[in-house]
Each structure stands twice: as structure tokens, then as C-alpha cells.
Amino acid sequence: MIQFSSDRQLKFRKYWLIYAVFATMLAADVFAQSSYSREDIKPIDRIVAVVNEEVITQQEINEVLQNTVQQLQRQNTQLPRMEILEKQLLERLILKRIQLQRAKEIGLTVSDNDLDQTLRRIIQDNHLTMDEFRQVLLQEGTDMNRFREEIRGEILMSRLKEQEVNSRVNVTENEIDNFLQNQANSPAGNEEYRIAHILVQISEQMDEAQIEARHKRAETAYESLRQGADFVRVSAEFSDAPDAMQGGELGWRPLGQLGSPFTEMLVNMQPGEVTPVVRSPVGFHILKLLERRQQEQKVTIIEQTHAQHILIKVSELVSEEDAHQLINQLMERIHNGADFMDVAKAHSEDASASAGGDLGWVSPGDTVPEFEQAMNALLPGQVSPPVRTPFGWHLIKVIERRSQDVSERQQREAARHTIHARKADAIVQEWLQQLRDQAYVEYKVEDN
């Protein structure tokens, strides 16, 4: 139905909350306390790399480097050597630039309205006013316009990944059945693992000597960990994963999302232990188990609403005023005795029109907030006044309500998400490497 919100929108909301918390934690004075002074960063702007037809400058690296040092300092992490850190960050800037170029190439955009909504969620979720948020940005040495463009780029890369990776991943009902059966039969089936990882990436274009060199790099990282080196520092120095500068933290993951051979290793590990180097199609991995816990099996009862609605869209042909006037006329007809279903069939512009506007049983979160709030305010049999949502003007009628046990449905949805994430994880690094291999990248070496 056109008024339903998407899972993707919900995922964005969670992602930007994490992004905002990370951004607001950075303190401007930490860098001054670092063992690296501002003088350690090259002050002269110059071109350091050409990516297709665009350039990356020293100034761009300096800005990312400063924030990264701040973050590592906050984690009390011993910093890698400056030249190593700078090289790692340059590779990340190159990959980011390639993704943004690809998004532009296939026509992906982020509207100002989408951007404004995301920024409002960031500010609200962090319990800040707009003025307070601007002050935080100023303390970080940036401003709202620059922050907006950073967020626009992150949304574009998320949409690119959604279109080119996630949308191609299919999960069947049979896979869900098998997953749940295996989970029920496994002693560790209900466990979750908080893990961090290091990835030394390989690609199909590499010959045996190059792959062996990458293997030795991974083994060097593993040996550093065995000697007691901090995992966050080793991740920053050796890992090719996008989250390397955050210590490779992957958060909490159910066992079924990790896949073989990692599952066999993790079930026998204790928090703080690391795996030896493990090879996969995309590279060499090292995992660290941070914590483990049992997933709670909860009974979930929700209130569902059986509802109908009528939608009049606002478009180039129908102005806001005309749409509002028409929805008011339809409301008057219903108040004067016209059947809601007949009016919906004749006038609604939603896909549900042929069913008399019947939406079936609607669960919390299924619809956009404006629609849900208006629907929840109605008693069975009542019709709402006109309601404006991003899709247009609505009339909503509540038919009945019920309490529903959705535990099994949620369990299946959780299994679907876990399987989808595992499949996506298996191909996203390969996809990123393919983008990198197909791009023209030229490094500009500074003359001595």
C-alpha cells in the first residue's frame, strides 16, 4: 500500500542515530592532547590521488586524519604510525569517492527534503535543539552546510549498496524454515555474539604472489595481537574493512549470521579471545569475541487495527488546495450517509481502491507516523477528518481492533533478516573490490 513505510527507512533511522552519537562524541580539544600535534599533519594542500576524473587533496586527508586521531585517542588506543594511518585513510577516501561516482552514474540522488528529514531525526534522537546542534558542529570545526553534504554522501552510499547488493539478495521461506530448525537443534542457537574483525582483502585480479603477500599481512596482524597489541590499533593499521577505524566493531550478531567456519570457532571461544587467520573468498579475516549473551525469547502481543482509507494525491495536475477541497467534499458525502467503501472505490488513488480502501490488519509501524497517529485516535466505526501525509490527503476509517500474538511472525522476520545480512555480508566486500578494480586511480607521490 502506498502509505506504508519501508524497512529501508527504518534501517536508515537506526543508522543515522549511530552516526550522530559518534559525531557528537568527538571533542575538538582531544587532538591537541594527542601525541601527534597539528604540525605533524602536512599543512600544504596538494593533489594526492586522482580517482577517475576527480582528485583527492591533502586537505581532505588532513581533516579525516584529525577526526580519526581524536576517535582513537578517546578509546585510549595506541596510535599507528602517521604514515600508515594516512595511507589507510587515503584508501577509504578513494573507495568513498568511487561509490559516490557510481551513485551519480546510475542516477541516484538525495532530495533536500529527504536530507532535512534525516537531519531532524539526528537532532531529535540526540535530544538537541537546532541551535545546540549547530554549536556541536562548530566545536567540531565544521558547519551545518558541510555536515549536510557529508550526510548526503552517506545516504547515497547506503542507497547504492541497497540497489546493487541488498536488492539482489533473496531469502526463501524454505531457508527460513531450515534456519529456525537448525537454531532449535543447536545448543548455541539462541546466543548472540558481539564481535570485532580485521579484514585483509583480496580480489580475483590478484596472482598467487599478491595473495600470499596479503596472507602474510594478515598473519603479521595476528602475531601483533598474540603479542598483546590492542585490537583497535591493529585494525586501524591493517584492516581493509570500512569499519577499521572504529576498531572493526560489528556489534551484536546472532550465530546464524556469521556463517561457517566462524560459527564453529566462536562457540568454543571466551570473550577477549581472537581467531587465527581465516580465509574467505574476499580475503583473510581475524575475529575477536568481545561478549556473548543469550537472546531472550519473548511473547509479543500487539494491537492491530483493521482500517480503510481514501487517498487523494497532490501532483503537478492536482494542487494542494484542490486535493484538500476534494477530500473535504468526500468527507461530507460520507457524513451525509454515503458508504465509505463505495466512495473509496470511486475516488481513492491508492492501490487499495479496488478493495474499497481496505488495508486489512495494520500493525504498529506499518504506516507513516501521520497516518498511524490519526488512525490510533479513532474508535471503531469512526472516520477521521482529512489527514495530510507525504503521500497526499487521506480519510481513515477504523473497522475494528484486536490483540495479536506476533511472536512467531517476528521470529521468522528476525530469521529472514539474519539470513539476508549473512548473504549480503558475503558479497558486499567483493562488490566494493570490483568497484575499486574498475576505477582509474593514480597516486601522486610527493617529490623529495
Swiss-Prot record:
Superkingdom of the organism of origin: Bacteria
Isomerase found in the keyword field: yes
Main location group: periplasm
Domain PpiC: 190-291, 302-400
Species, as recorded: Nitrosomonas europaea (strain ATCC 19718 / CIP 103999 / KCTC 2705 / NBRC 14298)
EC number: 5.2.1.8
Catalyzed chemical reaction(s): [protein]-peptidylproline (omega=180) = [protein]-peptidylproline (omega=0)
Protein's UniProt name: Chaperone SurA
Keywords from the named record: Chaperone, Isomerase, Periplasm, Repeat, Rotamase, Signal
Function, in words: Chaperone involved in the correct folding and assembly of outer membrane proteins. Recognizes specific patterns of aromatic residues and the orientation of their side chains, which are found more frequently in integral outer membrane proteins. May act in both early periplasmic and late outer membrane-associated steps of protein maturation.
